[in-house]
A protein has these predicted regions:
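Ferredoxin-type iron-sulfur electron-transfer modules and their immediate structural context
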Residues: 1-75, 82-84, 88-140, 153-162
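Short proline/glycine-enriched turn/loop segments at secondary-structure junctions
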Residues: 146-147
Length: 162
């Protein structure tokens, strides 16, 4: 019932509440999509090893964020948090025209992976073989392969690797 009050628009929560006979919660909390399951925090720290996100606050004020409320500088933009989130509230996109503003008024434009929730802009690498920019591979795909990776795995795009 408390999850339903916190995240009434999350489909998985509505279905679970209906199965439990809860149509409308007695409490009102807000409209936060995050259900605080902790899967994103767990996969980031235990499986990926980046420790880029954590819980902050206590009780009703608890939420997931980057440490010290800043950009998640340890984030490798792998997408593991996006993949495990049952509420689908973590957003990530690959863009070719990402802009970063630096002190002094300069602007850097290029291809990058953006993780909106953690305020991360992860620049794509240039392929050593063909020179084209490519996004970082997903650690989930790497774990599924279950075999040692070649030394230049992260320096060559998928097309040149085939």
């Amino acid at each position: 019932e408390l999850l339903m009050a916190r995240s009434p628009h999350v489909k998985a929560i509505r279905e679970y509440a209906a199965a439990m006979g809860i149509e409308k919660p007695r409490f009102t909390r807000g409209n936060d999509k995050c259900i605080l399951c902790g899967l994103c925090v767990h996969v980031c720290s235990e499986y990926v090893g980046a420790h880029a996100i954590t819980f902050s606050g206590r009780g009703a004020e608890k939420f997931v964020c980057a440490p010290l409320y800043r950009s998640a500088t340890d984030c490798i933009a792998c997408g593991a948090c996006v993949a495990v989130c049952p509420a689908q509230c973590i957003t990530m996109e690959d863009v070719t025209d990402a802009k970063t503003y630096v002190p002094g008024g300069a602007e850097e434009v290029g291809s990058a992976r953006l993780v909106h929730n953690w305020n991360v802009r992860f620049p794509w690498k240039q392929c050593k073989s063909c020179g084209k920019p490519f996004p970082p591979p997903s650690p989930i795909e790497l774990m599924e392969q279950g075999k040692p990776l070649p030394k230049d795995f992260f320096a060559i795009c998928d097309n040149c690797r085939k």
